[in-house]
Regions:
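A short, flexible beta-alpha/helix-coil linker loop
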Residues: 100-103, 160, 305-309
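Conserved Class I SAM-dependent methyltransferase catalytic core
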Residues: 5, 9, 13, 254, ...
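Short, charged/polar, Gly/Pro-enriched secondary-structure boundary elements
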Residues: 44-51, 159-162, 376-377
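Conserved S-adenosyl-L-methionine
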Residues: 175-293, 308, 316
Length: 511
């Protein structure tokens, strides 16, 4: 098969993680962009990218690139394409537009021009026109315009790839599956130890951890992909990919999820059971403040409340409790915390060894690693302890460059006018900073003065009061206050379920 260009979309901050995934599944010419990674591959690679990638939101196949200075240019260029190759008689289509341009201030107008060009071509050639379907089209198109550079692509995924298909119910403000998988992959964990999420909510981190530990393809739960409706769909090839579990591996440790809210616990258990992963995951009701040291070496990954979408009383006290529990009950292990407010991180009271900026929806968060050990850092290193792996050092360097050069404080939406306003605001602030420095040097005889620089993460940080305690595989013990211990046994046993006959509910593209 011949190779062609493909584009994998993702969240800002996960580009390098996605690029590594693409390299591992055999993609060629992998290039990192903003919220996307381009690569080349054949039809099999396109199918595998949709089916196997944990951190991709959707996979696009560009079919035309052109310059457009006006809406009429877009119309004429789209009409040049032979649409009978892509849209068969009786099939429906839809168009999604992403526009960053002074010439095209309204992305909907671009959408209409693309639709008009396609419909007019069919009407002129055949006397009939294809129908538009927004909810469930046969062919999905995506047009991306940056100033005058336009790229028209076929969307091979359909609904967002974060919609795995295992989530039956969710709690308030659930963590996006793609972000959860990206967080776990950034830690470097692949199932070598037990995994703990003390504030598990609907169980997303625990389920994504199990998929990564077993190297299971997240697409196994989905009912369909958009490419299955394409005229050139190769059903035999995709069935081969779908049924190939040769890359899956054994997982000899265990995953524990805890939450203080029994409703969240029941929701997480339902989702774990739907994913057929009850053998690997135990979900129980427990409070993080009662967390005792796990019997087995473990990694802890937690997404506490931020105080944004979920109102959390005593937010800073929650983070203070997290720091206290990590310090006294997690010695010899490592913990990773995702948060949004700087003051919440400060309340933890521990020095992070790694800080990685990532976006949770529109919130610019940080994902921090804490290596918990006795004594001083020097003593820890002398005993062979590793604070940062080589991969983590490279990751930090990439993220620092990413943050330094980023033009926007908030995550860009698809509105060109807002994007331009952010750029102008950024340039103005940069100019004002330089002016302030010049004024200070002039006023104080050229002496330099240190300014207190506070890192901003899109606003204040958060915390969720849901979370638990941990125990041993098959029944770890956790202290529940002074009166005794609670035993946490293994959860439900369930068979792994494939996506084809799997009933699921719909979820939003972004949680």
């Amino acid at each position: 098969m011949n190779d062609f260009e493909l584009i994998a979309k993702t969240f800002m901050g996960l580009e390098s993680v996605l690029a590594k995934e693409l390299t591992q599944i055999g993609a060629n010419n992998v290039q990192i962009g903003r919220r996307m990674v381009s690569f080349t591959g054949d039809k099999e690679m396109m199918y595998r990218a949709n089916f196997q990638l944990h951190t991709a939101i959707r996979i696009l196949k560009p079919i035309a690139k052109f310059k457009a200075a006006s809406a009429d240019d877009v119309y004429e260029e789209i009409k040049k394409i032979d649409w009978s190759q892509y849209i068969e008689k009786g099939k429906t289509f839809s168009v999604d537009s992403v526009v960053y341009s002074e010439e095209f201030r309204n992305s909907r107008f671009v959408t209409y021009k693309v639709k008009d060009a396609i419909v007019d071509q069919f009407r002129e050639k055949t006397g009939t026109r294809p129908n538009i379907s927004v909810s469930n089209p046969d062919i999905r198109l995506n047009i991306h315009i940056a100033e005058t550079a336009a790229t028209l692509s076929l969307d091979s995924s359909g609904e967002s790839l974060h919609r795995r298909g295992y989530r039956q119910e969710s709690v308030e403000a659930p963590l996006n599956e793609v972000l959860a998988a990206g967080m776990i992959l950034m830690t470097g964990w692949k199932g070598e130890t037990d995994f703990i999420d003390p504030m598990c909510g609907s169980g997303t981190l625990a389920i994504e951890a199990a998929l990564i530990a077993r190297n299971m393809s997240p697409g196994v739960f989905r009912k369909e992909f958009a490419f299955e409706k394409w005229p050139d769909f190769d059903a035999e090839l995709f069935d081969t990919i779908y049924n190939d579990d040769s890359q899956e591996r054994e997982f000899t440790h265990h995953i524990y999820g805890y939450d203080i809210d029994m409703k969240a616990v029941n929701t997480a258990r339902l989702n774990v059971r739907a994913a057929g992963l009850s053998k690997d995951i135990t979900i129980d009701c427990a409070d993080f403040k009662d967390f005792t040291k796990p019997a087995e070496k473990s990694i802890l990954v937690v997404n506490p409340p931020y105080g944004e979408r979920i109102s959390t009383p005593n937010l800073l006290n929650t983070y203070k409790m997290i720091g206290e529990r990590l310090k006294h009950a997690f010695m010899g292990n490592e913990a990773w915390v995702l948060s949004y407010r700087q003051e919440c991180f400060e309340a933890i009271g521990l020095k992070p060894s790694i800080k990685i900026p990532v976006f949770n929806g529109s919130l610019e968060c940080e994902f921090r690693k804490y290596s918990i050990f006795d004594g001083t850092m020097k003593e820890f290193r002398q005993e062979g302890g590793i604070v940062k792996t080589e991969d983590e050092k490279r990751q930090m360097a990439e993220k620092h460059r990413f943050k330094k050069n980023r033009e926007f404080k908030k995550r860009l939406d698809e509105d060109a006018e807002n994007a331009e306003a952010d750029i102008r605001s950024f340039k103005f602030r940069s100019f004002e900073r330089r002016k302030d420095n010049d004024d200070r040097r002039g006023s104080f005889g050229g002496k330099r003065f240190n300014r207190d620089e506070e890192k901003s993460f899109g606003g204040k940080r958060f915390d969720r009061d849901e979370e638990k305690s941990f125990g041993k595989r098959g029944g770890k013990s956790f202290g529940r206050g002074r009166d005794g211990e609670k035993s946490f046994g293994k959860g439900f046993k369930g068979d792994r379920k494939g996506g084809r006959g799997f009933n699921k509910k719909g979820f939003d593209d972004e949680d």
